[in-house]
């Protein structure tokens, strides 16, 4: 029995899972703390991919082509996306806190259209991808792109960093408290608007990091963010809103199931994800690791 294709799909699924985690972690954090469903989250991820591409190209022209230039390109794009996220919260999102959910969704959907047209204006409609020129390695009867290990390692490192931040730092504990009772946090004299701005910036920064990490694996293209945001919402629903552990576990489930579904049933890959969502909602409507009630 040739296990090569299964090994390849496993690594592909784990890589997809880590990208989904990086994206969904920011989405879950924003919703858990701010109660905002950011429909433009994946579009900001797409924007970060294009920004990373441009920075990588610029650095290559200045210092010569090298795969190591990807790191400063990703970090620069992530920092820029954090600033963009801070500005979006300050001037747009903040005005929707007392509005109904449909109005919030309309605003973030408008951002999808605006950012999409901005990408088309600056970068055109061509696909963008970074070719690192790294040779594949042979493993278990198949050739594996070693960049899969980079993506998986990055995802695990960010997950560990988020856990440490949320459980071992004062600001992280404030963020966790705001998930369950933001009124009590405000009563303690903590300025909630600043918490919101920093959380939104951090969530967009995670999406930005995911966009840069994803770029050497598959090309960025206009419209791909629409499929990705659906998978992100599925991850957050399965794992439970506001739960980082749930987001991590659900990302692995969705990524691996989607990858193997492409191998066995390509047309039904997305349907398999929705089937998992339906089963989880019937069994645990608040998600695998979510809380049943919010006070």
Name every feature range the model reports, one short phrase each.
Residues 1-23, 51, 62-72, 100-105, ...:
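Membrane-interfacial amphipathic/re-entrant helices at transmembrane-helix boundaries
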Residues 2-19, 165-170, 196-239, 258-270:
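Inter-helical junctions in multi-pass inner-membrane proteins, predominant
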Residues 11, 34, 39-87:
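Membrane-embedded helix boundary and interhelical linker motif in transport proteins
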Residues 19-27, 40-60, 206-214, 227-239, ...:
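Hydrophobic alpha-helical segments within and immediately flanking transmembrane helices
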Residues 27-50, 98-103, 171-174, 192, ...:
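Short, non-helical or kinked segments that cap or interrupt transmembrane helices
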Residues 63-111, 118, 249-254, 284-285:
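Alpha-helical transmembrane segments within multi-pass membrane transporters and channels
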Residues 95-96, 101-168, 195-198, 220, ...:
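Transmembrane helix-bundle core of multi-pass membrane transporters
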Residues 143-220, 244-249:
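Helix-loop-helix "hairpin" substructures at the membrane interface of multi-pass membrane proteins
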């Amino acid at each position: 029995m040739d296990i090569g294709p299964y090994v390849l799909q496993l690594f592909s699924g784990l890589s997809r899972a880590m990208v989904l985690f990086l994206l969904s972690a920011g989405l879950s954090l924003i919703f858990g703390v701010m109660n905002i469903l950011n429909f433009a989250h994946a579009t900001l991820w797409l924007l970060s991919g294009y920004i990373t591409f441009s920075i990588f190209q610029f650095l290559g022209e200045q210092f010569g082509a090298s795969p190591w230039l990807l790191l400063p390109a990703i970090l620069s794009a992530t920092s820029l996306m954090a600033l963009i996220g801070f500005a979006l919260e300050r001037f747009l999102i903040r005005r929707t806190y007392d509005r109904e959910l449909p109005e919030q969704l309309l605003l973030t959907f408008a951002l999808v259209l605006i950012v999409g047209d901005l990408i088309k204006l600056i970068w055109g409609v061509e696909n963008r991808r970074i070719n690192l020129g790294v040779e594949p390695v042979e493993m278990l009867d198949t050739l594996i792109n070693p960049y899969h290990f980079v993506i998986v390692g990055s995802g695990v490192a960010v997950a560990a960093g988020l856990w440490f931040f949320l459980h071992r730092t004062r600001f992280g504990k404030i963020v966790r408290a705001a998930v369950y009772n933001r009124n009590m946090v405000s009563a303690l004299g903590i300025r909630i608007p600043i918490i919101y701005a920093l959380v939104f910036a951090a969530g967009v920064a995670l999406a930005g990091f995911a966009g840069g990490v994803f770029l050497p694996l598959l090309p960025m293209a206009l419209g791909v963010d629409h499929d990705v945001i659906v998978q992100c919402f599925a991850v957050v629903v399965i794992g439970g809103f506001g739960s980082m552990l749930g987001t991590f576990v659900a990302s692995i489930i969705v990524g691996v199931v989607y990858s193997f579904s492409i191998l066995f049933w390509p047309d039904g890959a997305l349907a398999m994800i929705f089937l998992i969502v339906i089963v989880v909602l019937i069994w645990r409507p608040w998600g695998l690791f979510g809380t049943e009630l919010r006070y």
